[in-house]
Curated annotation (Swiss-Prot):
Binding site for Zn(2+): H149, H151, H174
Organism for this UniProt entry: Pinctada fucata
Subunit structure: Homooligomer; disulfide-linked. May also be disulfide-linked to insoluble organic matrix.
Gene Ontology cellular component annotations, sorted alphabetically: cytoplasm; extracellular region
Name of the protein: Nacrein
Primary location recorded for the protein, binned into one broad class: secreted
Function (record text): Acts as a negative regulator for calcification in the shells of mollusks. May function both as a calcium concentrator and as a carbonic anhydrase required for production of carbonate ions, which are assembled to CaCO(3) at mineralization sites. Is important for shell formation in both the calcitic prismatic layer and the aragonitic nacreous layer.
Signal peptide residue numbers: 1-17
This protein's UniProt keywords: Calcium, Disulfide bond, Extracellular matrix, Glycoprotein, Lyase, Metal-binding, Repeat, Secreted, Signal, Zinc
Protein family (similarity comment): Belongs to the alpha-carbonic anhydrase family.
Amino acid sequence: MYLHLTALCVVIPLCYGASMFKHDHYMDNGVRYPNGDGICKQLNETKCDAGFSYDRSICEGPHYWHTISKCFIACGIGQRQSPINIVSYDAKFRQRLPKLKFKPHMEKLKTEVTNHQNRAPEFEPEDGENLYVKLNNLVDGHYKFHNLHVHNGRTRRKGSEHSVNGRFTPMEAHLVFHHDDQTHFEPTRTKLGGAFPGHNDFVVVGVFLEVGDDGFGDEPDDEECKHILKGHHPDNNENGNGDNGNNGYNGDNGNNGDNGNNSYNGDNGNNGVNGNNGYNGDNGNNGDNGNNGYNGDNGNNGDNGNNGENGNNGENGNNGENGHKHGCRVKKAKHLSRILECAYRNDKVREFKKVGEEEGLDVHLTPEMALPPLKYRHYYTYEGSLTTPPCTESVLWVVQKCHVQVSRRVLHALRNVEGYKDGTTLRKYGTRRPTQKNKVTVYKSFK
């Protein structure tokens, strides 16, 4: 994004928090690379628009971003760098953390997406499109939607930037909000420990994305993609009627989900995807594949352990992480899946473009498509940084506990986007920064 230079001066006489300069994902892009091809030719620059890459052979990789430019020094010596591994049982419950909402609610936005070379393509709202994040008491109401982008990894299973208890998902979506430059920061009533003074320029909502095959329909053809990208979707509401059920993919007590007697992620579903009880059903005895939970915090064997995070014995209780009240249900994001499939496959996004030669693809989307249903928006929050240079430490992270599922085709299409001049795609190096080792306090909105 664009932002005010937040001075974070270290022992060296160097202020390394730059938020007012321009960079991908977080800054409005002017110049992304010194030569437009994605190559950093000179190291130890002072420019904040110096190029960076996930490929160490043409530009220092994530572990050495701080050596590219003095402006990037926070990437190496910062105290609140992101992403992090979130340890769920160490996170502190804060009773007054607000619900995550948006204003206006379920607003469909006109966005433009382009090829961003070795970065994740991002969906940026067109001028005049306004959407604000609502986190009453935690931040003021002036954080405006800046973009949606999705990170992937070098492997299909490890693509998220954050992890929970050491576990990753294939992708992670980021909804980036930036404080409106036209307004002053208003004091908030809920403080996160007060370890870091000043204000956060950004609120970034992180969503763990899983992938699946069932229930997403056939791959859309080019003609169908034209309608999808303009915001026209079939009438099958994501929270309405499901594939084979009376009450939809996410129906609380739907009679028939994808393969079971009750909804795909039904709170009391008898049959989830392949198990005796819902995939993440609040009272489901079994996770992904029968007796074995998906990611049991205290499960005997993790992915295939006896007790999944939302299985019989979650982190602290018999039902879900802390019992029925705060269990999860994986939303199957059908509309978002088809939008991402069509966008990533389109030549304007898929093919490598030099700076100045980008072609924007118009896409209509609702950012809330990427989020769990409102009643399942339990989250972890902490004060961190941008995950790309300059790694500015001015971000309030809101990382969703509950996952969202998209089609496997989305992952395939994203990994096949060309990120380099020679045609190398994003599958080779990924677009994720490794988790950082610094100690930050993480809070959570659920017990």
